[in-house]
Amino acid sequence: LHAARRVYKLRLKRCSLSDLEERVLGIRREDDIPGSEIPALWQEFLKTKNDEKLLSVFDHNLQDVQSMAVLLRTIYDAHQEPMQQVYMEDLFSVGKVYDSAGRYDIAERCYVSVENGVCRGMAGRALTRIYRRTERTADAIALLEGMIASNSGGIFPYVELAKIYEHRLRQPEKALTY
């Protein structure tokens, strides 16, 4: 579930297996026993040795395993073809996974492709970090100036431009303009 949460948490907020089944895989369980009841059924079996109610536990566990297999394939596909993501939150999140792994080329493609909303500002910040790490100062400046021109990113682009001009380009006078 950890890998699924890294991809889907930004969009879904809650990422229990049942949430992922329903909202990512489109699976809705019928006549399923809630996982919270399983320990009590197990304790009852230990006391009575009546295994009749354990069948529902086995069925529940089988569904869990099957869902995890389908979810694993879905996550694999999301990483293999990140640009096929329907939701910008998922595309941004896949970019973060690649960013964390040092695969800046793929992360950059994901971040650049994020088109709207809150994720666009987060993608701009993440792209700035990649450009700084890879010493692409001109790209960072262009991105940050674009963020300022479009009035996105709040104070972030101003602070980052000031840092670039003061520390990297050694132009403290220019840094003060931001």
Predicted regions mapped to residue ranges:
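Structural motif corresponding to the intra-repeat A-B loop/turn of tetratricopeptide repeats
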Residues: 101, 134, 168-169
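Structural register within alpha-helical repeat arrays
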Residues: 94, 126-127, 131, 161, ...
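Metal-dependent phosphoesterase core characteristic of DEDDh/y 3'-5' exonuclease domains
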Residues: 1-66
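Residue at a conserved register position within TPR or TPR-like alpha-solenoid repeats
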Residues: 98, 131, 165-166
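Short coil turns that delineate tetratricopeptide repeat
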Residues: 118-119, 152
